Amino acid sequence: MSLILTINPGSTSTKIAVFAAEEELFERTVEHPHDAFSGLAGVYGQLEARRHAVQTMLSRAGYADARFDIVVGRGGLLAPMHGGAWRVNQTMLDILESAAHGEHPCNLGAPLALAFARSHGAHRNVQAIIVDPVVTDELDPVARIGGLPELPRRSVFHALSQRAAARRAAAQLGIRYEDGRFLVGHFGGGISVGAHRHGRVVDVNNALEGEGPFSPERTGGLPVMPALELVRRGVYSFERMRSIVQREGGMWAHLGTNDLREVQRRMDAGDTAAAQIFDALAYNSAKALCALLPALTGAGQDVPSAPPVDAVVLTGGMARSGRFMQAVSDRLRYLGPVIVLPRLEEMQALAMGGLRVLRGEETPAEYGGGMS
């Protein structure tokens, strides 16, 4: 029986799971407070702390001496590439460490996978791979065009989570994912919303670089001129503004917490500011999903006579909050069925990618550093 370790570093947590083929044996999450990594040099400075967290979780679950047949990490910010499995190699690690395509904790998925393939591999040639990285790029050509030729839109999103959730929703509806049309929202430290048309994610907000709704940690879209003015006047340096956009904006900037549970506790205690930000978060998320409706119909052809949405699918860590999901869903039900998948599908999606490799159904691609 193939033993698979999956590792998923995110903005606010590190998740691991162990699978015996398709069967999940154990899953654990360690939450990272907003100040857990203060004083460390960038995201890569968190590598040892997160490696120790993974080792601790394995040890406490009785897997300290386990030997894995493959280790699968969450993919990071690389050049645009097709979905599927990719082998972790030195070129990939160098680019992730340099943050050449952006800095985010998902950049640690590949080095963590390689570290545990080496320390806990069943043999010396155990592979470390990534699956469906966040830079999976399937955008329609028209979706790439923005308001400045020098700044074409990029596809950077929670590809693994979104596609796994959409596939699960399609199965619930009794249709093939490749035949359906879905609006999918991933709700975590960042929020990404995607239009899934016939098996491709043809438009999505780049949640890392300031598109879309604000989230627990990110600003989302900001008015450009006032933001530039803050930098010009020296209120914020460029580096400080980047940190705010990616890690210290949104709910954190308004309320001083990135924990939705804490916000709900404040609401229950009568905090009207918390209630207002909670409602704004739900409103902006629903608005972003609705904005993707044109992407589901294509360009002047294959236009459905009925509403184009087979389902709206909501997933991610915040989907565990029934209260928040209700606030989002109530604004979307006129579009069609709303399917909430509160249990994260990412770990299983990572494991299934590893299993396809072990079974010889898929050969990991070799990363060369350029657009693939």
Curated annotation (Swiss-Prot):
Biological process per Gene Ontology, one example term:
acetate metabolic process
Q: Which Pfam families match?
A: Acetate_kinase
Top-rank lineage group of the source organism? Bacteria
The reaction(s) catalysed by this protein are: butanoate + ATP = butanoyl phosphate + ADP
According to its UniProt record, where is this protein located?
A: Cytoplasm
Molecular function terms from GO: acetate kinase activity; ATP binding; butyrate kinase activity
Q: What are its E.C. numbers?
A: 2.7.2.7
State whether keyword Nucleotide-binding applies: yes
InterPro entries under this entry? Aliphatic_acid_kin_short-chain, Aliphatic_acid_kinase_CS, ATPase_NBD, Butyrate_kin
User: Matching SUPFAM superfamilies, A to Z?
Assistant: Actin-like ATPase domain (SSF53067)
One cellular component term from this protein's GO annotations in UniProt: cytoplasm
EC main class here is transferase
Keywords carried by this UniProt record: ATP-binding, Cytoplasm, Kinase, Nucleotide-binding, Transferase
Disulphide bridges, residue numbers: none
The record's HAMAP family line, in alphabetical order, gives: Butyrate_kinase
Protein family membership: Belongs to the acetokinase family.
Q: What protein does this entry describe?
A: Probable butyrate kinase
Its encoding gene is what? buk
